[in-house]
Amino acid sequence: MSLLDHVDPEISAVIRKELDRQRNTLVLVAAENFTSPAVMEAQGCVMTNKYAEGYPGKRYYRGCAFMDEAENLARDRCKKLFGAEHVNVQPHSGSQANMAAYFATLKPGDTIMGMNLDHGGHLSHGSPVNFSGKLYHVVPYGVSRKTEMLDYSEILDVARECRPQMIVCGASAYPRIIDFKAMREIADEVGALLMADIAHIAGLVAAGVHPSPIPYADIVTTTTHKTLRGPRGGVIMCREELAQAIDRAVFPGIQGGPMMHTIAAKAVAFKEAMTPEFRRYQEQIVRNAAALADRLIENGFDLVSGGTDNHLMLVKLLKEGITGKEADETLESAGIALNKNMIPFDPRTPFVTSGIRIGTPAVTSRGMKENEMREIADLITEVIRDMKNPATIESVRSRVRALCERFPLYPELG
């Protein structure tokens, strides 16, 4: 970073401090991961200089031949990776991918069914504070109070009553496998489109570790970071008959020029995701999540739905008598980064919460396995059981640093 040190030492110092934080923190935020140096190199390339409004072969500006090559590589690799008929790699984020999907297929005021945010859904699936909840009539569905899992017969009942134009399946905090086939059958019964948002599980789906929605959903959206371990961005996959509407909704519908440096980085990430190493990595994510969840249960914690099938888990803190906000703040001071999270039927507000969400993608990227997950679960337990004791916090912080040093992050960055 010698050039940045010279041009902007303040920003250079902030970046170095963030690198140090990532290296010496157990990152358990389920939505975060560590992308490869190759992806970061592509994202910092000269393609950031180029405007490329439009699509390959049909650009508004001249000089886009190599932009076309890069975007076609990204599209073709994503198609192959997921088995999709059509792919748009231009969305700047997952929320913009969802917006484009809605704009391509719905009218303002149409009815959408989406998973309740409090039960594990996402803001862009119809939350009243989000554009999706303001533009469309949203009927939420949730998990069973008894099992804390999706009850597809209950979802069918809701669909029959409201007759939505679209059903959105997918979540940001749901620890179980989603039955996309069942959701397709529900959508077919009421004549609705089915959209699957796989932002959290895209890497698992790409590797065959989680069932794919591609055979069942009309539209599939995702982010390219999280388990997919690419740059921050979005992707839309759809059936060929929706391709033109989707592409027009992205550009010129909601975006102008695409971020070609990010699209180049997406192409790199898709190539990495086609390797046997990536599949082994995804399998390890799931094994690690199971090991961490099992140890937390052994240590006396209650988990939403009793465990996990994927990369994340939700820990209920009601019987501990503490809030998610208190837990995540104290854990961060001990070097463990996760997030407070609503649990199903949570009596507290989203800014306080009764739970925490824990994910294993980032620590798995560092090379940690089941033994380390059990160690991490014990560290979390120690902090939560003795939150008011500064000596405990400092002791855990020291052990977290030692664990991180055993699995170094980005040694090539100096």
Curated annotation (Swiss-Prot):
The keyword Cytoplasm applies. The keyword Transferase applies. One of its GO terms (molecular function) is glycine hydroxymethyltransferase activity. Keywords: Amino-acid biosynthesis, Cytoplasm, One-carbon metabolism, Pyridoxal phosphate, Transferase. Pfam families: SHMT. Its cofactor is pyridoxal 5'-phosphate. Pathway: One-carbon metabolism; tetrahydrofolate interconversion; Amino-acid biosynthesis; glycine biosynthesis; glycine from L-serine: step 1/1. GO terms for biological process: glycine biosynthetic process from serine; tetrahydrofolate interconversion. It is found in: Cytoplasm. It is an enzyme of class 2 (transferase). (6S)-5,6,7,8-tetrahydrofolate binds at residues 117, 121-123, 241, 349-351. The modification N6-(pyridoxal phosphate)lysine is found at residue 226. Its main location: cytoplasm. Belongs to the SHMT family. Catalyzes the reversible interconversion of serine and glycine with tetrahydrofolate (THF) serving as the one-carbon carrier. Also exhibits THF-independent aldolase activity toward beta-hydroxyamino acids, producing glycine and aldehydes, via a retro-aldol mechanism. Homodimer. This is Serine hydroxymethyltransferase. It comes from Methanothrix thermoacetophila (strain DSM 6194 / JCM 14653 / NBRC 101360 / PT) (Methanosaeta thermophila). The lineage of its organism: Archaea, Methanobacteriati, Methanobacteriota, Stenosarchaea group, Methanomicrobia.
